[in-house]
């Protein structure tokens, strides 16, 4: 007797198991706002896609290369895929809270995706302390120090391939995400 299992949906830390058939449709029709993925340039969109693909592969147990359909290979970024895998493995093992990485179809950027983009952009600008500060918002300090070399390798490899993140645009998205994620009562010091 064969066991039948429902197909797994795309990875998304924000969703339960109910309504899996409509996940992609719901994500594609998310409300537009300042954290819209289309507001980012291609290198930043590529990094967000890679983060989301890594989470999808991690949750489904599939090969990261298979999930990305050899996307890194197409751009000659095999070393970047390894660096991303290293950083995300550290994050998955040590996250200090639930991390919001959306499904690959989602049109909006989560605050945590903005934090990771800020870390990559800071590393590309050789601002490693700021990259560590960003990483510490998702993981303990020791884990951030372990993840930093992987993030720096990813940033360097992307820059060598001509994929420099616009650090000002990423920073403004990060600030908007941080404002959206912070409850009104905690935004002001009294």
Residue ranges of predicted features:
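Polar/charged low-complexity regulatory segments
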Residues: 1-117, 121-190
